Amino acid sequence: IRCFITPDVTSQACPDGQNICYTKTWCDNFCGMRGKRVDLGCAATCPTVKPGVDIKCCSTDNCNPFPTRERS
């Protein structure tokens, strides 16, 4: 499977055994100005996250593009 990987947001082949792409988003101190922080990558299973962190997992090539920021 191929997933987008941060920080470069390039499509890369995942290591053997990692067949899930994820998009993790959360707010830091600059959320109001910059929007949510985004982490993209590969995983063997969908990661569990802390409260306040959103995660989306998928299992097709390049299914985790960088999310577009919602304009307020």
Curated annotation (Swiss-Prot):
* Entry-linked SUPFAM superfamilies: Snake toxin-like
Q: What tissues is it present in? A: Expressed by the venom gland.
Chief site of localization: secreted
* Species of provenance: Naja anchietae
Short name of one Pfam family: Toxin_cobra-type
Q: Name one GO molecular function term.
A: toxin activity
Protein name (record): Long neurotoxin 1
In the UniProt record, does the keyword Disulfide bond occur? yes
Give a short account of what the protein does.
Binds with high affinity to muscular (alpha-1/CHRNA1) and neuronal (alpha-7/CHRNA7) nicotinic acetylcholine receptor (nAChR) and inhibits acetylcholine from binding to the receptor, thereby impairing neuromuscular and neuronal transmission.
* Statement: the UniProt record of this protein carries the keyword Nucleotide-binding: no
| The entry's keywords | Acetylcholine receptor inhibiting toxin, Disulfide bond, Ion channel impairing toxin, Neurotoxin, Postsynaptic neurotoxin, Secreted, Toxin
Q: Which CDD domains does the record cross-reference, listed alphabetically?
A: TFP_snake_toxin
Compartments where located: Secreted
Q: Which cysteines are joined by disulfide bonds?
A: C3-C21, C14-C42, C27-C31, C46-C57, C58-C63
